[in-house]
Amino acid sequence: MTNIRKSHPLFKIINDSFIDLPAPSSISSWWNFGSLLGVCLAVQILTGLFLAMHYTPDTATAFYSVTHICRDVNYGWVLRYLHANGASMFFICLFLHVGRGIYYGSYTFSETWNIGIILLFAVMATAFMGYVLPWGQMSFWGATVITNLLSAIPYVGTTLVEWVWGGFSVDKATLTRFFALHFLLPFIISAMVMVHLLFLHETGSNNPTGIPSDVDMIPFHPYYTIKDILGLVLMLMALLSLVLFAPDLLGDPDNYTPANPLNTPPHIKPEWYFLFAYAILRSIPNKLGGVVALVLSILVLAVIPLLHTSKQRSMTFRPLSQCLFWLLVADLLTLTWIGGQPVEHPFIIIGQLASILYFLIILVLMPLASIAENHLLKW
């Protein structure tokens, strides 16, 4: 009799995906972030579900329902801060996961990569709508500013904004639909994650060398289950430290003031993980141009596979490309810093230069460096 995990229709799928899956023997800790993202998603869905049991999506009571969760619900404060800081961990893991994909050339798995980009957009949309729900000052004004960007679309813009708002301003209808969509999207994301994994398992994982590893594969369990558990423990330690010692470290103090349409905060800014894109948006004086740049700042990832001019897949043995990659990382950190600063000299010019450099590195310098490396290696 064959083992039930290899014969049962349902267990067989799980077995082929997480137990007997052949994995390259050389994959490093940079390959841990996929499983960490799965854990982040599960944590967000569970904490979100319990928060939704106590939350009321109504402009009059939303802010006070969140206060009620923190003060009166058993361990409600843990749920709320796990959910808020869990989103930050989610984005840290996402950025590292995408960075790993760029560095090691994993983007050559085009289906997996493109679904990953769609997932990134979906997670960003979910996080944005979630930020609106506590109905604090930054929630309200963030929603107003970001949804207003749709009005830059020629001809249909204004109609589209009013359609999203459900009225002539961000109000009760907006909050209700944002709550409904914020609840729904993580389940759609979960389904897309399965498709992401389906395409990944069609090709098998990449590895740090970028060389096909079919000749040297090991089973996922126990080797990588143990390795993933180590990553998981480290991530949970970081998350719990944040939740229990500095829960408001990454939040905005303005969001502890109930939303007031008559009083604009001095600096409207999104959560830290959107600041790089927000800086790119602000660096262009034209509204439509800014919106286009904002979308392109993420969509540019879809062009990376088309601009792969190197004869090697990974950057492991490509020092020029490595320098540009780390310059890109430094540039993104600069943009994140600028996004949180007021719109005044010298921050405006720094933001504009960093935005130009961001697109220049990805679209021009990296392909040119790859061609140069090919010539240096006489390929």
Swiss-Prot record:
| Gene3D superfamilies with a match to the protein in the record | Cytochrome Bc1 Complex, Chain C (1.20.810.10)
Q: Binding residues for a ubiquinone, per the UniProt record?
A: H201
Kindly give the SUPFAM superfamilies that the UniProt entry links to this protein: a domain/subunit of cytochrome bc1 complex (Ubiquinol-cytochrome c reductase), Transmembrane di-heme cytochromes
- Its chief place of residence is mitochondrion
- Specify which residues bind heme b b566 according to the UniProt entry for this protein: H97, H196
State the UniProt keywords alphabetically: Electron transport, Heme, Iron, Membrane, Metal-binding, Mitochondrion, Mitochondrion inner membrane, Respiratory chain, Transmembrane, Transmembrane helix, Transport, Ubiquinone
Residues at which heme b b562 binds: H83, H182
A Pfam family matched in the record: Cytochrome_B
Q: Per the UniProt entry, what is one GO biological process?
A: mitochondrial electron transport, ubiquinol to cytochrome c
Q: How is the cofactor bound?
A: Binds 2 heme b groups non-covalently.
Q: Matching PANTHER family, A to Z?
A: CYTOCHROME B
Indicate the quaternary assembly: The cytochrome bc1 complex contains 11 subunits: 3 respiratory subunits (MT-CYB, CYC1 and UQCRFS1), 2 core proteins (UQCRC1 and UQCRC2) and 6 low-molecular weight proteins (UQCRH/QCR6, UQCRB/QCR7, UQCRQ/QCR8, UQCR10/QCR9, UQCR11/QCR10 and a cleavage product of UQCRFS1). This cytochrome bc1 complex then forms a dimer.
Additional notes on this entry? Heme 1 (or BL or b562) is low-potential and absorbs at about 562 nm, and heme 2 (or BH or b566) is high-potential and absorbs at about 566 nm.
Could you tell me what this protein is called?
Answer: Cytochrome b
The coding gene here is MT-CYB
